[in-house]
């Protein structure tokens, strides 16, 4: 059951604040002048929960002996017809970086210092889709998973519409924020030693590239959703998200798609090569020119585009794989990156989950060759990555999906905020520069508690 209302009277943020539903999640994309930023999704009151934790898969708390990703697809996919809307009900959540250990031998997982599941999704049939191009809001109540009657659907829809009319108590209050004093979990010297170890392995022919990361944490007070509201203004990005999982929240502004499937077309978006933003347009242009002429950065990008082509090629029809955008400079709030786009047509016998398995984790957060690099990451890094560098997004009941790489992402748990950032190590990397790159990438999240113009 669907009701369409005018999109000029209600924003996704205001709708989130007014709705009383449980486990609300918001997915956005800014700036909205891009076609890819046409839609925002707000989902609430999930029908059930799927979680993989400590090696056990659970559905609503009941243990299930199944492959987690296959099970997720089976319970979510409902052969819904495709529409212009990106989401037709389904699962929203994340697959952690370390899930790959179920499918590949990559060694002993480091210590888990945060304690989030390896996979966590809620499955929704109550949601809103904001079409910013047509200025329409689709308010939807479905019975895909619950089998609710038409009477129950109408009652639920009217309840949502009534809640949307009533102002939230804190609509006009200042954001409840506090500056966060982030501390690195390892010393700069230790990270630089990790870089040199990786370079030695690369020089000896063990691998071509390895993406090493470091974690930062801070005590946090304030309203988690207000941190998201600040983030979307201070660091607009291709993938913006706020997830409330109950005992922890995830806030993110990822610039990079891991993989999407839409009407059988599978797409990935390699991003590699970084410079800080300049203070002026002229400085931006100079830095972009420098980035494009940097042999180390462009070689790294070419390597990861090739890796993306290989990943997509394994699940796509012969000769359908194309690089539709190649090594273009894209500007973000604090940094600029080299970006490319790789597309292919998914083999008819495969599903979106096959595409996710083929691409997780991205080469841009692991390295090349991918399996070898992941083994070295486990040997060099001291903490389990968890959400960081995994996949975060949705799997629609239509069989389509869209997952970002979980970078520029913050975990809030037990009054602590966690942020992680990495750098791609290659043969001629300079350890101090790679350390500084992780600092530059983390800035968008470590400054999330600061109100800035």
Protein language model features and the residues they cover:
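Extended alpha-helical targeting/anchoring segments
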Residues: 1-453
């Amino acid at each position: 059951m669907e009701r369409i209302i005018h999109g000029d009277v209600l924003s996704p943020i205001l709708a989130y604040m007014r709705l009383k539903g449980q486990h609300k999640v918001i997915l956005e994309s800014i700036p909205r002048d891009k076609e890819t930023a046409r839609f925002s999704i707000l989902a609430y009151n999930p029908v059930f929960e799927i979680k993989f934790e400590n090696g056990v898969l659970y559905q609503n708390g009941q243990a299930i002996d199944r492959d987690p990703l296959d099970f997720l697809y089976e319970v979510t996919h409902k052969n819904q017809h495709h529409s212009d809307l990106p989401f037709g009900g389904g699962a929203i959540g994340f697959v952690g970086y370390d899930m790959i250990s179920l499918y590949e031998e990559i060694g002993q997982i480091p210590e888990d210092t945060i304690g989030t599941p390896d996979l966590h999704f809620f499955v929704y049939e109550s949601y809103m889709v904001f079409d910013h191009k047509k200025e329409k809001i689709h308010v939807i109540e479905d019975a895909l998973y619950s089998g609710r009657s038409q009477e129950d659907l109408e009652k639920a829809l009217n309840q949502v519409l009534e809640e949307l009319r009533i102002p939230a108590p804190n609509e006009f209050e200042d954001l409840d924020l506090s500056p966060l004093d982030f501390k690195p979990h390892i010393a700069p010297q230790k990270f630089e030693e990790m870089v040199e170890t990786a370079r030695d392995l690369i020089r000896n022919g063990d691998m071509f590239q390895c993406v090493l990361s470091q974690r930062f944490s801070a005590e946090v007070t304030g309203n988690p959703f207000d941190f998201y509201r600040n983030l979307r203004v201070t660091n607009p990005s291709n993938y913006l998200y706020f997830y409330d999982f109950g005992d922890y929240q995830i806030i993110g502004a990822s610039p990079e798609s891991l993989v999407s499937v839409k009407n059988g077309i599978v797409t990935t978006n390699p991003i590699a090569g970084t410079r800080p933003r300049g203070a002026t347009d002229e400085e931006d242009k100079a830095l972009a020119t420098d980035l494009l002429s940097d042999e180390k950065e462009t070689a790294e990008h070419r390597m990861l585009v090739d890796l993306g082509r290989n990943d997509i090629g394994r699940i796509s029809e012969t000769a359908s794989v194309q690089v539709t955008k190649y090594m273009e400079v894209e500007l973000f709030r604090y940094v600029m990156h080299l970006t490319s786009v790789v597309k292919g047509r998914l083999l008819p016998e495969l599903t979106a989950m096959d595409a996710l398995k083929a691409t997780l984790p991205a080469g841009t957060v692991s390295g090349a060759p991918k399996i070898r690099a992941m083994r070295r990451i486990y040997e060099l890094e001291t903490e389990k990555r968890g959400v960081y560098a995994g996949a975060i997004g949705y799997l629609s009941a239509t069989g389509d999906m869209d997952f970002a790489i979980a970078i520029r992402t913050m975990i809030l748990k037990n009054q602590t905020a966690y942020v992680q950032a990495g750098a791609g190590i290659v043969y001629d990397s300079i350890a101090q520069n790679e350390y500084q790159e992780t600092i530059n990438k983390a800035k968008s999240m470590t400054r999330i508690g600061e109100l800035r113009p």
